[in-house]
Amino acid sequence: MLDRHLHPRIKPLLHQCVRVLDKPGITPDGLTLVGFAIGVLALPFLALGWYLAALVVILLNRLLDGLDGALARRRELTDAGGFLDISLDFLFYALVPFGFILAAPEQNALAGGWLLFAFIGTGSSFLAFAALAAKHQIDNPGYAHKSFYYLGGLTEGTETILLFVLGCLFPAWFAWFAWIFGALCWMTTFTRVWSGYLTLKSLQRQ
């Protein structure tokens, strides 16, 4: 919901940063891998209850995720880079809730499981439509900076990061955050499946 409004404002700042990073030894895929390696640290940090340390690596991961895309656009977007980026993004989004579960299994296990279950819904509907949109060459005007078709919704990347930030700042409330956000994710999944189905169905009639 917030991505399409936030990205145009952040993109100029990222472009300024990648001017410094645009060196022969630095590649978009390299930034993706470094960002993921940093993001993976959130899992042990959360499991140990080091919430502020986890917050730092989560934010660094998201910063590098923005920089790798900006550097790729400065040079050339590639299918391989887009595939690597989205694959590692989804793994990162899954490991953070798992870290909260490990931190307090009695309190967070059920809510964290609900959140991961909801992430499967948003992720599968997102990727399934992206694949078919590319096949039918459907335009993606709202997210032209993406290397694949980006089907929006109520809970997108920005909202997910806000959830993780709130969880790190108020870990005792993570279970409540997870229950509420998971419900919003299922609303997103329903709207994506329905709108995606109608869009693809209309193409068959043309």
Curated annotation (Swiss-Prot):
GO terms for molecular function: phosphotransferase activity, for other substituted phosphate groups. Residues 1-37, 103-111, 170-173 are periplasmic. The chain crosses the membrane at residues 38-60, 80-102, 112-134, 147-169, 174-196. Keywords: Cell inner membrane, Cell membrane, Membrane, Transferase, Transmembrane, Transmembrane helix. Disulfide bonds: none annotated. It holds the Pfam family CDP-OH_P_transf. InterPro entries: CDP-OH_P_trans, CDP-OH_PTrfase_TM_dom, CDP_ALCOHOL_P_TRANSF_CS. One of its GO terms (cellular component) is plasma membrane. It is found in: Cell inner membrane. It is a multi-pass membrane protein. GO terms for biological process: phospholipid biosynthetic process. Residues 61-79, 135-146, 197-206 are cytoplasmic. PROSITE patterns: CDP_ALCOHOL_P_TRANSF. Belongs to the CDP-alcohol phosphatidyltransferase class-I family. This is Inner membrane protein YnjF. The lineage of its organism: Bacteria, Pseudomonadati, Pseudomonadota, Gammaproteobacteria, Enterobacterales.
